[in-house]
């Protein structure tokens, strides 16, 4: 496989007989080995060869497969039958999944071949992919810096050319932020648009599977495959849609609202990229204005006061009795204590403790219940803003990739990395990070992203916008040097 070809190009090559699924798989594996030092993947799919052969057989039998032979990487919290699903944790170091997540199953049904599982922050709790039990993932643009998180491995797999597309999960920005820091597209669909069945839960009311890609066409291609109602997920929406890219003409008259609260505290490179993107939109005939969403001031606090309690509940099942690596301790209580002490990393333990505290008697109303009220206010303010504008825009992250270890010992600084993304999850909206430029830091060019937000169930509007931005030259997509 020629690194950095798009999924659409590879699928067409297989469909025309120019190449085979097996050849694409071998190319992806060779590329994964070449960039092994980035630590993007935590495991390879031992069944990939037979899956590639099966795709070839289906093609020969006359099946039309939109992702024919396309190699793909999925985050290590998305279950795939017969592969380890560790969630970046010692707790699940040897867990082999007996079933496949709906999103991954749909990819395989469309002809994709799952190459392996991508590294991640432990249980998706982080913004840097430093807390994984498999070690940190490195940013391909500067190996001394983080790729973002928690889906850092999925972002790096696409940015470094292992696979043209990948799947991650986004609870508070975990697809969009690493996409921005690695210079690729990252899309968070409307909550419920993609089934969560088979996704290991972090915060169930916020989690959403989403794709990474190097082209707008590939985003649309993946969403046409993975979106749709799933009776196995009670939060899944029955809202059929056809995803397609738009042309430059679609920007004429588009109402774009810049969220005023996102304009402070950004680095010069982020400000420049946002400004250039807005100039391109104006030049193509879009109407650009500003809109205020005052309650965003409380988004980070509300997000963590909701996510942490949900995490404390979801992770209660890992006690070594049914789930998790059991540590013997004499009696059951001691064994459970040791299992959780040794199985969970520091950040996961911190969030479980804070979440349990926020739900405890006497504090529930003061913290969790109040955060839920703020969540409702934020959602209402977004609805009001969409009465004036078709899409809203912010930086994806206020800064480019930071150095490894720079924020690891300062939880509040790490949490602030999600300042532009968490509100979208609180409101359940779709959002897209577009690679929008670069900022030079210490002699290295680091990618930055711009985030576009649409009303609920208007996901296709964002993918059409991505294609239009490509058409007017507003997307800055480059390949990092090995």
Curated annotation (Swiss-Prot):
Q: Which superkingdom is the protein from?
A: Bacteria
Q: Which family does it belong to?
A: Belongs to the amidase family. GatA subfamily.
Q: Which organism is it from?
A: Deinococcus radiodurans (strain ATCC 13939 / DSM 20539 / JCM 16871 / CCUG 27074 / LMG 4051 / NBRC 15346 / NCIMB 9279 / VKM B-1422 / R1)
Stored SUPFAM superfamilies: Amidase signature (AS) enzymes
Q: What does this gene product do?
A: Allows the formation of correctly charged Gln-tRNA(Gln) through the transamidation of misacylated Glu-tRNA(Gln) in organisms which lack glutaminyl-tRNA synthetase. The reaction takes place in the presence of glutamine and ATP through an activated gamma-phospho-Glu-tRNA(Gln).
Protein name, as recorded: Glutamyl-tRNA(Gln) amidotransferase subunit A
InterPro entries to which the protein is assigned, alphabetical: Amidase (IPR000120), Amidase_CS (IPR020556), Amidase_dom (IPR023631), AS_sf (IPR036928), GatA (IPR004412)
Q: How does it assemble?
A: Heterotrimer of A, B and C subunits.
Look at the named UniProt entry and state the broad enzyme category this protein falls under.
ligase
NCBIfam families assigned = gatA (TIGR00132)
**Segments passing through the bilayer:** none
Among the GO biological process terms of this entry, one is: translation
Q: What EC number(s) has UniProt assigned to this enzyme?
A: 6.3.5.7
Which keywords accompany this UniProt record? Answer: ATP-binding, Ligase, Nucleotide-binding, Protein biosynthesis
Give a Gene Ontology cellular component term annotated to this protein: glutamyl-tRNA(Gln) amidotransferase complex
Query: Per its UniProt record, what PROSITE patterns does this chain match?
Result: AMIDASES
Q: Where is the active site?
A: 75, 150, 174
Query: For this protein, what reaction is catalysed?
Result: L-glutamyl-tRNA(Gln) + L-glutamine + ATP + H2O = L-glutaminyl-tRNA(Gln) + L-glutamate + ADP + phosphate + H(+)
